[in-house]
């Protein structure tokens, strides 16, 4: 759904973006190596949302992040439940709420999801990210409405992140290695995603809004 959304943004179907949100109510499986660090959610899960914001909208000017610990994660950590907002030079905002608590456990019913929404001057789009249903096969979704196409348009597909990413993003990386070319999403660009993640942690630690340029070298 992120690639479909990127197409809508690039073709100006939604006009100029005004606000983007991601709302995650899902419980990740924390890999053992993450338990060795005090940094948890943004490095282990939120980084995917940070990367999505950068893929869709580019680098933010400023980042503000707040967090609390996750009651379910019994090991020491700083960030369990997080909320971070990216502010751009043109006043656009993108914000994500990453709620990894999400469920008070049995016997309560579950309501697990990841929803996203982008509002623009000419239209809006919304959808879901399907991975929380894994191992059940649950494709991500998108639908949009715009001044050019007022009725909801909702394309569908049956592919999911795993294993179908091996035919998409991952195959692009493998082709680049084989051909000696720059991949569509490069490691050089990913360094800037890490800078955004570190800006989130600096915002938490220093309790302030952090300019991304504080984390980048002048040549970056």
Predicted stretch roles:
Residues 1-76, 207:
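Predominantly a Rossmann-like dinucleotide-binding segment in NAD(P)-dependent oxidoreductases
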Residues 17, 63-65, 128, 184-186, ...:
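Short, hydrophobic secondary-structure boundary micro-motifs
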Residues 38-40, 157-160, 179-183, 187:
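Active-site rim elements
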Residues 44, 48-134, 167-179, 217-220:
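Contiguous beta-strand/loop segments that form the cofactor/metal-binding neighborhood of enzyme cores
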Residues 89, 137-138, 172-220:
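C-terminal helix-rich "cap/oligomerization" subdomain common to oxidoreductases
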Residues 91-93, 124, 152-157, 182, ...:
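Short, mixed charged/polar active-site loops
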Residues 116, 132-151:
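Short polybasic amphipathic segments
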Residues 158-170:
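Active-site loop of classical SDR/Rossmann-like NAD(P)-dependent oxidoreductases
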């Amino acid at each position: 759904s992120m690639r479909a959304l990127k197409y809508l943004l690039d073709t100006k179907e939604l006009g100029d973006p005004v606000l983007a949100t991601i709302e995650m109510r899902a419980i990740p499986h924390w890999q053992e190596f993450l338990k060795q660090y005090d940094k948890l959610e943004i490095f282990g899960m939120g980084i995917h949302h940070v990367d999505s914001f950068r893929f869709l909208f580019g680098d933010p000017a400023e980042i503000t992040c707040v967090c609390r610990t996750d009651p379910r994660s019994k090991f020491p950590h700083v960030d369990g439940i997080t909320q971070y907002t990216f502010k751009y030079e043109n006043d656009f905002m993108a914000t994500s709420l990453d709620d990894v608590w999400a469920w008070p456990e049995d016997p309560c019913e579950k309501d697990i999801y990841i929803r996203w929404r982008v509002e623009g001057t000419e239209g809006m789009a919304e959808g879901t990210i399907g991975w929380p249903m894994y191992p059940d096969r649950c494709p991500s979704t998108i639908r949009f409405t715009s001044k050019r196409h007022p009725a909801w348009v909702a394309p569908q597909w049956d592919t999911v992140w795993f294993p179908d990413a091996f035919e998409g993003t991952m195959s692009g990386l493998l082709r680049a290695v084989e051909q000696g070319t720059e991949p569509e999403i490069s490691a050089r660009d990913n360094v800037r995603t890490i800078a955004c993640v570190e800006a989130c942690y600096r915002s938490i630690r220093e309790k302030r809004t952090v300019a991304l340029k504080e984390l980048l070298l002048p040549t970056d």
